């Protein structure tokens, strides 16, 4: 993202303007923002207060139309959760514990209803590969996990899950890719729906970079 509010890609330098934005009085207290595939339900996690919040967009995919809290859920953890991700079905949620370098797994007895969240007593440590993980992502069927060290190594690591979406069955594939020349800090990344593209955020350069697989 450059100073004109445009996103540029690494492959072909295409860009587009960011027309919508949203500000909150406590914006910087959010460590993670998740959007349900319906484009209506928004889930916000505040790392400092350990509070997961659910809100709705009155206009799908338009963040300016976000409403007030519908419900919230306090996550009881001794670490600091810096990022969170749902699985595709909305019945699992995963948190990246940047204090202990683990990914912790929770279940929702009613999909997408955070008031039904319980800890599965399942976690996976990435400390053998990365001491400062900044982001993670799953592939579409939950059989692969990807973790990136945003500020220290700037390396993405690949893991396999023996049982899909069960974080306790993860194991390192001995596969990695370095983004060390990209930026001084790469805080986040995401894949496209088919897994053929990776989009990596560069903090210092205020850019989003596109890679092909």
Where are the model-predicted features located?
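Polar, enzyme-active/binding microenvironments
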Residues: 1-213
